[in-house]
C-alpha cells in the first residue's frame, strides 16, 4: 500500500504538521527524506529497512553524503537533503551559542560538540571560544590524533584564546571507541589546561567527552572547581 492510501492522520508529513516532529518515529522521520521508497515498498518500510541494515539512526546519519547516496532507498537527492538537514542543525546550535546561550543551555553545547566530533574515526580535540557575555566567537579543531588519542598542548589553546580575545573557553574531544568515560589522562590534561588559562585570566567553563550516547561534562561532575 502506498502512503497516499494511508489514513491522513497516519501519513508522516501530515502527522508532523498536526502533532509536531517529536510525534514521529525514527523511521517516519527518515521516510520524509526517502520520498517514494523502493519498488514494492512504501517510504516508511524502506526507512525501516535502512535503519535495520545500516542503523541505528545515529550511525546512519553520521555517514558522509556520498556514502548515503549509495544506499538502496536513498540516492543522491535524499542523501543531499539529509546532509543539508544535519548541517542546518549544527548551524542552528551554533547560532544559539552566538546569542549567548552557552551557559543557559549546557546540553546544547554538548550536542554541538557531539555533532561536530562524534563521527570521527580518530581523536579530535576542539575548543569553543566565548566573549565576556559567553557568546560564541569561534569553534576550532586544534589537535588531531589516532584512534587511541591526541596530544594536547595547553599553551596552544591559550594562544588561540588570546588571539580571539576570548574571556572563556569550552573544550571537547571524542573517544573513537564510543566510550565517553574520561580517562585519567583526560583529567590530567584538563587540569593543566585549567591552570594555564587561569594564568591569563581566561575561564575554562567545561570539557565535554564525546562517545556513544550523552556527552560527559567535566563541569557537571564538579571536576573544574
Swiss-Prot record:
Source organism of the structure: Xanthomonas euvesicatoria pv. vesicatoria (strain 85-10) (Xanthomonas campestris pv. vesicatoria)
Protein name, per record: UPF0758 protein XCV4028
Binding site for Zn(2+): 173, 175, 186
Family, per entry: Belongs to the UPF0758 family.
GO-annotated molecular function: metal ion binding; metallopeptidase activity
GO biological process, one term: proteolysis
Superkingdom to which the source organism belongs: Bacteria
Classification via PANTHER family: DNA REPAIR PROTEIN RADC (PTHR30471), UPF0758 PROTEIN YEES-RELATED (PTHR30471:SF3)
Keyword terms: Hydrolase, Metal-binding, Metalloprotease, Protease, Zinc
Amino acid at each position: 500500500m502506498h502512503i497516499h492510501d494511508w489514513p491522513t492522520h497516519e501519513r508522516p508529513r501530515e502527522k508532523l504538521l498536526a502533532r509536531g516532529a517529536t510525534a514521529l518515529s525514527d523511521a517516519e522521520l527518515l521516510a520524509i527524506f526517502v520520498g517514494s521508497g523502493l519498488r514494492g515498498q512504501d517510504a516508511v518500510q524502506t526507512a525501516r529497512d535502512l535503519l535495520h541494515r545500516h542503523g541505528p539512526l545515529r550511525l546512519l546519519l553520521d555517514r558522509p553524503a556520498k556514502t548515503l547516496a549509495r544506499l538502496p532507498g536513498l540516492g543522491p537527492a535524499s542523501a543531499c537533503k539529509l546532509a543539508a538537514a544535519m548541517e542546518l542543525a549544527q548551524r542552528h546550535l551554533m547560532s544559539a551559542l552566538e546569542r549567548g546561550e552557552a551557559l543557559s543551555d549546557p546540553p546544547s553545547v554538548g550536542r554541538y560538540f557531539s555533532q561536530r566530533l562524534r563521527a570521527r574515526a580518530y581523536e579530535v580535540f576542539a575548543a569553543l571560544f566565548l566573549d565576556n557575555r559567553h557568546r560564541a566567537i569561534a569553534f576550532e579543531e586544534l589537535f588531531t590524533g589516532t584512534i587511541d588519542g591526541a596530544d594536547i598542548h595547553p599553551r596552544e589553546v591559550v594562544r588561540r584564546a588570546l588571539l580571539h580575545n576570548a574571556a572563556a573557553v569550552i573544550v571537547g574531544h571524542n573517544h573513537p571507541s564510543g566510550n565517553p568515560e574520561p580517562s585519567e589522562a583526560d583529567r590530567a590534561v584538563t587540569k593543566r589546561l585549567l591552570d594555564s588559562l587561569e594564568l591569563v585570566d581566561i575561564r575554562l567553563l567545561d570539557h565535554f567527552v564525546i562517545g556513544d550516547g550523552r556527552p560527559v561534562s567535566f563541569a557537571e561532575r564538579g571536576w573544574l572547581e
